């Protein structure tokens, strides 16, 4: 049985300026509020400078400055963003240990992407000692918040018995959740499990259904499996 590997990717920096306090913030308003010490504004200003949103000229040094200020004032989003800067080496020297530290701070505050990223670093042993039990812990927290990549990696840990007792039933459960959230690798793995009767009785109809969904998403392995099942 061919099972696709864990999703060892960390998402590129995708930031949003939407919040209840600043539905459509002007640059001048954000700058003023940031200078007054408001952490939401400091975070937003940092993101503007980091991404060039709203016509702001990118300035990584200033982005780092304002995100650091927001972090010191308790902004969870700033902690995550600083982690991403260190992880990608954007505006700072790439430093996996620092990335780990910032992801850990944001993860402790319930930030789902940070929890997933922390799980990945534990899983890979980057920025910290490899620890499957900790990877399981943080994937679980992010998965419970409905974060699809975490659902997928959690299923993979159950399937392989890494950091947790091996359980095809639990692997099937979490692959299903990820598959329903359009994770094509999860759709493929779920189809394989139904095809082979792992975690559930064999079910060719469901196997074909999930192979088809993965194939529709562009998975070449799923396309080959569908041909072999015709």
Residue map of PLM features:
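TPR/TPR-like alpha-solenoid signature
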Residues: 43, 80, 101, 116, ...
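Structural signature of tandem alpha-helical TPR/SEL1-like repeats
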Residues: 23-28, 57-66, 93-102, 129-138, ...
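Bacterial N-terminal signal peptides that target proteins for export
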Residues: 1-9
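Bacterial N-terminal signal peptides
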Residues: 9-18
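Canonical positions in the second alpha-helix
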Residues: 33, 69-70, 105-106, 141-142, ...
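Terminal, low-structured helical/coil segments at or just beyond the last alpha-helical repeat
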Residues: 201-230
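Short helix-capping/linker turns of helical repeat alpha-solenoids
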Residues: 35-38, 52-53, 72-75, 88-90, ...
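Hydrophobic face of amphipathic alpha-helices that form TPR/SEL1-like repeat modules
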Residues: 44-51, 56, 79-88, 92, ...
């Amino acid at each position: 049985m061919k099972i696709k590997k864990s999703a060892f990717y960390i998402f590129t920096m995708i930031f949003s300026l939407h919040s209840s306090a600043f539905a459509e913030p002007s640059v001048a308003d954000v700058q003023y509020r940031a200078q007054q010490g408001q952490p939401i504004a400091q975070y937003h200003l940092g993101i503007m400078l980091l991404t060039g949103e709203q016509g702001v000229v990118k300035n990584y040094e200033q982005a780092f400055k304002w995100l650091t200020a927001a972090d010191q004032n308790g902004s969870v989003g700033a902690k995550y963003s600083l982690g991403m800067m260190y992880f990608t080496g954007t505006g700072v020297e790439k430093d996996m240990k620092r990335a780990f530290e910032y992801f850990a701070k944001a993860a402790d505050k319930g930030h789902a992407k940070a929890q997933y990223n922390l799980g990945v670093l534990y899983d890979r042993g980057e920025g910290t000692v490899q620890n499957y039990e900790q990877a399981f812990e943080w994937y679980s927290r992010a998965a419970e918040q409905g974060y699809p990549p975490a659902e997928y990696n959690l299923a993979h840990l159950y399937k392989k018995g890494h950091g947790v007792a091996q359980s095809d039933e639990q692997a099937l459960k979490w692959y299903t959740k990820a598959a329903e959230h359009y994770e094509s690798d999860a759709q493929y793995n779920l189809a394989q499990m139904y095809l082979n009767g792992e975690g559930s009785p064999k079910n060719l109809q469901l196997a074909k259904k999930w192979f088809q969904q993965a194939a529709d998403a562009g998975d070449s392995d799923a396309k080959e499996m569908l041909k072999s099942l015709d």
